[in-house]
Amino acid sequence: RLGVHTEYTERGVRLTLTGTPVTRLEEDMVDIPDLAQTFVVTCCLMNIPFRFTGLQSLKIKETDRITALITELHKLGYAVRSEQDSILLWNGERCPAESAPLIATYEDHRMAMAFAPVGLKLPGLVIRNAGVVTKSFPTFWGQLDKLLI
């Protein structure tokens, strides 16, 4: 639905553009809450309004991921908001972006990984405490570098 086909091969994963992504994404993420941060950031970067429900567990993860996402995306100019402590939504509304945003990770590995692709759109973006990824993916930054070569 985001315009990408994922194929698993012996060497890894191949991502292929398949066409135009959806113009709006609605998803119940109650069974996949750990994907929420990546989906939220990706949708903002792709200018795809969204409404993600089932996110009640995000408030009790490594950090309050709902508040963290809203705070950091506002720095980038995306007016994301929440409802009922379990819904994240964005209607495409923008807000003033910081000129040199520093993305906080809140000691949360998924925050660092979710915001990593933002650096492709905003070269020079700084993600504070980027080493927090070692909790789940110690070679994350090295693997990302290999993809970008």
Located regions from the model:
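A short beta-alpha structural unit
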Residues: 25, 53-63, 69, 86-92
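Acidic/polar loop patches that form or flank catalytic/metal-binding clefts of enzymes
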Residues: 5-7, 50-53, 127
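Self-splicing inteins and homing endonuclease
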Residues: 1-31, 76-107, 121-122, 145-149
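Short active-site-adjacent structural elements
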Residues: 61, 90, 97-99, 111-114, ...
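Short, ordered loop/turn segments at secondary-structure junctions
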Residues: 11-12, 55-57, 85-86, 130-132
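Short, small-residue-enriched loops and turns at beta-alpha junctions
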Residues: 5, 58-60, 133-134
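Proline/glycine-anchored alpha-helix kink/cap motifs
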Residues: 31-51, 65-81, 106-125, 140-149
